[in-house]
């Protein structure tokens, strides 16, 4: 949802939009909670409070004050990610299709012949990183840019089997216009750009697990971050390959040679980072015009020195000349050398051309070896061709996508490779590598061993759920890693499936109860965004591919009402109750009935079950930004840091009742996942709370009334306001609590309206208006380690007779309290108080 704050109402009506007027009687937290549970996507928030907007944004719900109708029209028609700390809106708006254009934030693409293959009459527009070049389009009171591009489709095309680019793009654009927007993918880059700088300010060692190509620019500014990926393809790995011949397959209709060169250099940069944790000088021989240098330098400040007879316009220093092996001595330490020399074929016949290529390959390799032979902190990526070669077994083979699969591949070398054993690799084996292997990632670091790193902050986004990881080891890591942000795939199934398919692999599934974390927040993507100064206009949906975000060691753990809080907890319930259910009171009715409380009069006002826990359990798929376990735990140790709002602390028994209702709901829905989750949350409540039950009571609290509007034959009809199991020396403690609660007890608005048979031979009158005070005094007794209340639900009633009688219904009648007392069962009254 998105909250668009206005000082005045607007005349126009918008679809899926609701108006909320700030309620001055309620504080900012209550207003934020009420707004978050509205069911439409767009909320027009009138007479807004800045504090309420701040609360919503910290909760991950995009909320922004608008100053003009133009701002409203722009934001209401699309989704966006909001940097509420820097006041920047990143739109995810594809309406530019109506201008017959596709967009890119990679400059090199604009220098290709891609426009020849676009839809008729369409053009390509460069918009800069995250749409930075579009800022001038929006003259708003806040910074605004459109981060939507088609780079994801272009890159998907490059790695796909498709060759017809126009048909591919047409299909993908139609899909984009008919399916739900993958909002997390669009905002993930914004998130990563906020996440890693903030982590590096606080942590010396940051480890990142499982980066992919979409992060290839993100980490250029962070050479000290240690990356873990799927490892490199080494020369020694070719032993598994059978020999093949030249294939000559075209990959792309437009020229992507620059993309290949960029990926090669980025691979070398990140390989260098892994070895030396600093930025290198980048030397390049050949590969002009290298327009992609603009992209790399746009993200991060690198020094490029290049040699080529052709121009290289974005190089820091360009030598318009050839480079020879004797020039190697000009190159400094702490550098990368990229060798991409290849003479144009011209009119040469195939045999002569092949001989030239092989000679150049050997020459390239000689330059690489000479460069690495002396000095320190060096990495070289060199262009090779399929031919009989002796190569170091530890050298890395690269084959990033290029326009055509021919005989070209690249070799990544470091100084250690020079001293390693060399192996003869036949030409046919190298063709087999070229024909069958595509390097899919610029990150080729070693795989992560799933174990605790005590001196590091671990970031593992979408990296550890795969079933090639041991599930128990992943859980152990999350439980024991003191500082981390790790995601795992949430169990969205109804049959409690332990793993589910994803693309061509399987993922383990998890619930929050699978983890025994200490001082960790378990939330959703949008809940996590709020912790890092971001919010989003589209909440997580139960797509089947959702993830829990688990943050260990955050200083926001105790700020229970600010981050990963209860906002939106009733939203799904409201959507169902007010559209599909038998009555809008259905949730209240079900919760009472499932706990054998049949007095439904005023059930929406006085409910015997925690709606928070119940909704968090049965609708966890729709809102898991609320960290339920943290909420329970902090209450159990009485360390809840509440900034504001009308706050009601639940008694532990209310939480147990909610779990019982949720379990019955799950059984009726045949939802095995909610059934297990509810059982495990109930077990967790019993673990963190030391709940004892007065199932064999020896004292009770009684309330006697001045007026009983029914006939009765007991001596003194009274309400048993809870039973206790205590030693006699604890009686003074109970009396002290009753005295403290005196005003609240006598202020109870107690009513009755009918009689019924509680069981055979027990005729009683119903009592309403006491449950909230009962749970409050339950909490006080619990915190003083006094056993109060039974394991079965407290059903307030007044015993009228021990004979079977007919039910009587009367107008709701207020009962006046005469006295409240503490009496020993089958004994005397030990304390009595009157108003």
Curated annotation (Swiss-Prot):
Subcellular location: Virion
Organism: Rotavirus A (strain RVA/SA11-Both/G3P5B[2]) (RV-A)
Family classification: Belongs to the rotavirus VP3 family.
Keyword Hydrolase attributed: yes
Principal location listed in the UniProt entry: virion
Subunit structure: Interacts with VP1. Interacts with VP2.
Region (GTase/RTPase activity): 556-692
EC number: 3.1.4.-, 2.7.7.50, 2.1.1.56
UniProt keyword Hydrolase, yes or no: yes
HAMAP family the UniProt entry points to: Rota_VP3 (MF_04124), Rota_VP3_A (MF_04128)
Lineage: Viruses, Riboviria, Orthornavirae, Duplornaviricota, Resentoviricetes
Superkingdom of origin: Viruses
Any Gene Ontology biological process: symbiont-mediated suppression of host innate immune response
GO molecular function: GTP binding; hydrolase activity; mRNA 5'-cap (guanine-N7-)-methyltransferase activity; mRNA guanylyltransferase activity; RNA binding
Reactions it catalyzes: a 5'-end diphospho-ribonucleoside in mRNA + GTP + H(+) = a 5'-end (5'-triphosphoguanosine)-ribonucleoside in mRNA + diphosphate; a 5'-end (5'-triphosphoguanosine)-ribonucleoside in mRNA + S-adenosyl-L-methionine = a 5'-end (N(7)-methyl 5'-triphosphoguanosine)-ribonucleoside in mRNA + S-adenosyl-L-homocysteine; 5'-triphosphoadenylyl-(2'->5')-adenylyl-(2'->5')-adenosine + 2 H2O = 2 AMP + ATP + 2 H(+)
GO cellular component: viral nucleocapsid
Residues annotated as catalytic: 718, 720, 797, 799
Descriptive protein name: Protein VP3
Function (record text): Multifunctional enzyme involved in mRNA capping. Catalyzes the formation of the 5' cap structure on the viral plus-strand transcripts. Specifically binds to GTP and displays guanylyltransferase and methyltransferase activities. Has affinity for ssRNA but not for dsRNA. Capping activity is non-specific and caps RNAs that initiate with either a G or an A residue. Together with VP1 polymerase, forms a VP1-VP3 complex positioned near the channels situated at each of the five-fold vertices of the core.
Disulphide bonds in the chain: none
